[in-house]
Amino acid sequence: MEKIKLSCAKCGFVIEEYTAEELATVPRKAKRYQYLKNKSSICPSCLASGRLQDVRVNEEGGPAVAAGAAAPASSTAAPVGHEEHAESPTPMMDAISQGRFPSHATELKKTKYPVQMYEQALQQRRTQWGYGGYVSLPGVASGVLVRASARPEITKGSNFVRIMDPCGNFFSTASMRGLCDIADKYAYGLLHLLSTGGDLELLGIPTENLKPAVEEITSLGFDIGSTGDDYRTSEECIGPAKCDLTLYDTLGLRAAWYKRFLDDVQYPRFPHKIKCKFAGCPNDCVRGCQKADIFLCGVYRDAPKVDQQKVAKWVEAGGDITTVCSRCPGQAMQWEAGKGLRVDEDSCMHCMYCSNKVPGVRPGGDRGVAVLVGGKLRGKFGPMLSRVLVPFIKAEGPDYKEVFDCIEKFTEVYDANARKKERVGDFILRIGIDEFYKLAGVEPSPQLLKQPRTNFFCHWEPAEVKDERRH
């Protein structure tokens, strides 16, 4: 069977490829073929502009011949004995590998990964992989993800599994060695550490190797999931394992999260995926406000704790306390030599700026979590930041019942009212934030405002105001 390729007339880069049977039987492809053939295009490889060349190739791999022209004969024969000087099949990867520093391109060639896919991605400046849906697998209710290949002549699509990482991403060396052995045995020999969702991904597993690979992964004590319309793998900051600013035990809460919601993590039941992130303080090292459908942020309600001796010692060592006070968003800090640092509790916004800058200032003791919802980077209406659902809840372990009951109530509202494949942020935007708060049973409070109002003109009906003397 004959194949028809539309390629760049200058560099020969193939833009699209069809079979003669497809052009004869599929009107959609025939129409696109005529459209591309008759228009001027820009080659993504050499950036040359012009009409595409119609090249026809026999299925058996015969010589390529441009339509309407004979194949050009070579003016000179190739010298005998110089085959070793042929052009490298991966020139751009070779260029990356040059130099005295280690190169990922060099290491990639040592694995089973089809390096021509990466070479073509470098040349075209875009990935040659795409989303290919799911593969059903017994024992994995959410399915296994498939990466579709845009270049089937190089390689077919490949599967990859997402492994739920332990709290804090603390892997033992024995567990990591076991995962590396599984990757070498069943896949490309590559581990993705870690994805933007906090997963460990095992790449390039052929369909026939999926079952034994998953069985060996689970035998190491790991769960497979984070696909489909369920709770995706939650991500948390390292919290009390290293940071002294954390306002609750992020690692303990995440462990309790999986005990409470493990079924919803492994069995899809929501209108769309739900990403959850846990930050120990408003610094938000996990970017939960930008990316999480459900975001638990550590907060405190009283004034920061000030160790006057540490602050004075820091100032004596050259600390610029004047600049810190002037840049406080709430203008709540005042420094007086000899009297120390004073913080106005009513003006404090609890933003962590002073705690980040001054060693002697630490968060207050009235601590808990704020529940925010609706953050995302993609979706129907584009990026959105999270909105406050509940401004403060005490995070009391080990089961964190009050926090999880609030989240469960919210997910019931989302499950009952959202449309299919509608993210949480898109759902809130469609019905309106006021209607969403009513459905969730949230009492209005100043902390729920997105921003202060700028229009000070107000209108009200007499019946809306109890004290008529205010009219």
Q: How should each PLM-predicted stretch be described?
A:
Residues 293, 322-343, 347-370:
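Iron-sulfur cluster-binding cysteine motifs and their immediate structural context
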Residues 18-21, 53-57, 289, 336-338:
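Short Cys/His-rich "knuckle" micro-motifs
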Residues 94, 132-137, 159-318, 467-471:
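Small-residue-enriched alpha-helical segments and adjacent helix-cap loops
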Residues 65-147:
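Charge-rich, low-complexity segments
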Residues 35-61, 356-364:
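Short metal-binding segments enriched for Cys and/or His
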Residues 8-11, 43-46, 328, 348, ...:
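Short cysteine-rich clusters marking metal-coordination/redox-active sites
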Residues 188-194, 227-229, 267-273, 335-338, ...:
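Flexible, glycine/charged-enriched surface loops at secondary-structure junctions
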Residues 22-41, 336-343:
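Short linker/helix segments within small regulatory modules
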